[in-house]
């Protein structure tokens, strides 16, 4: 089987069990399929994904004030529909990437091929797109863009795990963040001794306070790990 997020995706998932190569569009990739074909398993071990709760640096007051403005801007957009499909990146994601330092050396953001998605809600077909960014081949950021800002982040979990499984790096864990601008979910995957993953809790701008504080902390934590840990040749 080959995963085809787009016509020119630079990696592919392959299965030696397949007599013939079959192409699976990324929009159709599910966690169940990855479990069946690649032995992927979800782990409930509390210490498997400690990066989203442990070793987090406190934010400065200026950073908190900045994130408060980001949340205010997003809530203002919600009150004045329709949302532009690229508003997620402009209002929420870009400020987070900036504050996490991902626009600066030694990070280098690469864009993957976008994936078209569709879901039915109360008889209406909702169409959207998943834009994929990758940092140093270790940290994937998937952004769901649609007319509705509450497009469930679970829609992109299968795609995120597929990108992580396709990474040729096998010794180091890989991470992903999935966001629709309103909700954020982090994932961690390791390949040895067998592929397994876990996710963080769901962070949401609907929650009291400002969950962007924790989101930025986790982004910084994972970013430092990606830079610090050596990559195999």
Regions of interest found by a model, annotated:
Residues 21-23, 27-173, 185-233:
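A short, conserved, highly charged catalytic patch centered on acidic carboxylates
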Residues 2-4, 12:
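Acidic, Ala/Val/Gly-enriched low-complexity intrinsically disordered segments
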């Amino acid at each position: 089987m080959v995963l085809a997020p787009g016509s020119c995706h630079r990696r592919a998932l392959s299965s030696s069990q397949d007599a013939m190569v079959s192409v699976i569009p990324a929009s159709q990739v599910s966690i169940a399929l990855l479990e069946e074909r690649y032995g992927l398993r979800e782990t409930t071990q509390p210490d498997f994904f400690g990066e989203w709760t442990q070793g987090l640096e406190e934010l400065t007051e200026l950073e908190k004030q900045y994130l408060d403005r980001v949340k205010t801007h997003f809530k203002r957009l919600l009150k004045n529909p329709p949302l532009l499909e690229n508003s997620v990146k402009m209002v929420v994601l870009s400020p987070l990437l900036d504050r996490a330092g991902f626009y600066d050396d030694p990070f280098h953001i690469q864009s993957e091929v976008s994936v078209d998605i569709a879901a039915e809600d109360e008889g209406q077909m909702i169409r959207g797109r998943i834009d994929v960014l990758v940092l140093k081949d270790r940290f994937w950021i998937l952004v769901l863009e649609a007319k509705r800002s509450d497009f469930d982040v679970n829609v992109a979990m299968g795609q995120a795990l597929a990108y992580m499984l396709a990474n040729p790096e096998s010794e180091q864990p890989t991470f992903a963040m999935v966001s629709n601008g309103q909700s954020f979910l982090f994932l961690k995957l390791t390949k040895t001794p067998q592929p397994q993953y876990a996710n963080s809790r769901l962070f949401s701008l609907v929650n009291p306070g400002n969950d962007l504080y924790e989101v930025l902390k986790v982004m910084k934590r994972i970013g430092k790990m990606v830079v610090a840990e050596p990559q195999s040749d």
